[in-house]
Amino acid sequence: MAKIKKDDLVQVISGKDKGKQGKVLRVFPTDERVLVEGVNRVTKHLRAGQDNNGSTEGGLQVVEAPIHISNVAVVDPETKKPTRVGYRFETVEKDGVTKTVKVRFAKASGKEL
């Protein structure tokens, strides 16, 4: 189970892009990989051919490639540093009804994510 979700701000903690921060665009849970904005950019060679709209030009295109989930850490909203993620149960009262909800929080500061 991945503790990193879409739209989380993460920092790369190992690899060629170590230290870079970006927003998670997509999570691939079966492959344990995440697609992070501006990180692990690779050059893709496109062949000239056809697509749904007609013909396409060939050439080079720079795109983000997925990175393994163990190489990124969620950024703490308070300290702006990478942190681990924990879960806790909080009671919320809404319209006179008390509910228990599971909440993700940053272990370094205790702030809710």
UniProtKB/Swiss-Prot annotation:
Keyword Ligase on entry: no
SUPFAM superfamilies for this protein: Translation proteins SH3-like domain
Record-level Gene Ontology MF annotations: rRNA binding; structural constituent of ribosome
Top-level division of the source organism's lineage: Bacteria
Keyword RNA-binding: yes
Intrachain S-S bonds: none
Keywords assigned by UniProt, alphabetized: Ribonucleoprotein, Ribosomal protein, RNA-binding, rRNA-binding
Biological process terms in GO annotation: translation
Matches recorded under SMART domains: KOW (SM00739)
Gene Ontology cellular-component annotations: ribonucleoprotein complex; ribosome
A UniProt-annotated Pfam family: KOW
Family of the protein in this entry: Belongs to the universal ribosomal protein uL24 family.
Known function: One of two assembly initiator proteins, it binds directly to the 5'-end of the 23S rRNA, where it nucleates assembly of the 50S subunit. One of the proteins that surrounds the polypeptide exit tunnel on the outside of the subunit.
PANTHER family: MITOCHONDRIAL RIBOSOMAL PROTEIN L24
Quaternary structure and interacting proteins, as annotated: Part of the 50S ribosomal subunit.
Protein name in the entry: Large ribosomal subunit protein uL24
Organism listed in the record: Micrococcus luteus (Micrococcus lysodeikticus)
